[in-house]
């Protein structure tokens, strides 16, 4: 009977045989939809999948951002807020299982960590996590009821108008690629995003707008697709025709939610020490900005049982 490693070597002869041990260590090999080992036997009914990494496997430690304890900004026995750097997956992707923020947090804290929402790999910023089953349940209900505010900062080319807009549409997979999304007239998932212009400014001869963006639903690439559909793709977003830049200029900047066990509102903003260079440059050009939060009455009923 053929084994997984024998079949991979037969089908992928261009891959150095000596590299397979490291490739299995990283992950990315699946048999029947589950991670597998080199010596696992293959039956005729099993599907074998291999996801080739897009980075040098011998330099993965350099490719992905490293974890530092100061990335945890606040934490109690139930909940925490951390800063995830751009370039690090929130959870394990299909091509590898070693380098992701959830794994780093779990290993650092030596306890299970639940992530009620995720950030795209290219997005930096605040990430909420829970540490107890009771908080897991609360956060899930709070997200379902849209009681957790997540505010992003985005930079786009041009003078964004109107000053504030609510975007509602349906999003579905783009047939060109399984990761991409697009706006559809019917048959997709409903998506709702509130966009407010913070400032307009120029770098050299190009006009830019700084936007505060609050997604009220949590669809894949929701902010990126909605802004692109409005004619203002995010700077540094090659997936949706954004202007060229070395990074995606979208960050998770602020969180606001009710802590049910301390009976208080939590408001967390990204500390300046974690700001990307493009945001620091903008503040140096135009001065400080502030986030507009929802009215307090919008948070009535936050104590979910």
Sequence positions of predicted segments:
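RNA pseudouridine synthases
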Residues: 1-305
């Amino acid at each position: 009977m053929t084994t997984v490693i024998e079949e991979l070597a037969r089908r992928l002869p261009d891959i150095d045989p000596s590299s397979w041990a490291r490739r299995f260590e990283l992950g990315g090999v699946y048999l029947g939809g589950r991670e597998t080992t080199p010596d696992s036997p293959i039956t005729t009914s099993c599907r074998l999948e291999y996801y080739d990494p897009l980075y040098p496997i011998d330099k993965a430690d350099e490719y992905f951002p490293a974890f530092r304890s100061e990335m945890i900004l606040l934490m109690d026995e139930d909940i925490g807020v951390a800063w995830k750097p751009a370039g690090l997956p929130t959870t394990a992707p299909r091509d590898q299982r070693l380098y992701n923020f959830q794994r780093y947090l779990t290993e650092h804290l030596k306890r299970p960590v639940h992530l009620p929402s995720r950030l795209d790999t290219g997005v930096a910023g605040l990430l909420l996590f829970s540490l107890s089953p009771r908080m897991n349940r609360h956060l899930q209900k709070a997200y379902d009821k849209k009681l957790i505010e997540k505010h992003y900062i985005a930079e786009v080319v041009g003078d964004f108008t109107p000053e504030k807009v609510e975007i509602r549409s349906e999003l579905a997979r783009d047939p060109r690629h399984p990761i991409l999304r697009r706006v559809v007239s019917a048959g997709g998932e409903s998506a709702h995003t509130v966009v407010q212009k913070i400032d307009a400014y120029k770098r050299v001869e190009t006009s830019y707008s700084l936007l505060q963006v609050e997604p009220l639903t949590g669809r894949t690439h929701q902010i990126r697709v909605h802004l692109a559909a409005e004619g203002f793709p995010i700077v540094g977003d090659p997936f949706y025709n954004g202007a060229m830049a070395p990074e995606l200029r979208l960050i998770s900047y602020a969180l606001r939610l009710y802590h049910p066990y301390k009976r208080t509102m939590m408001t967390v903003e990204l500390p300046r020490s974690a700001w990307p260079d493009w945001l620091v440059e903008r503040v140096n050009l135009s001065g400080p900005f502030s986030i507009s939060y929802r009215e307090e009455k919008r948070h009535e009923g936050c104590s979910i049982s």
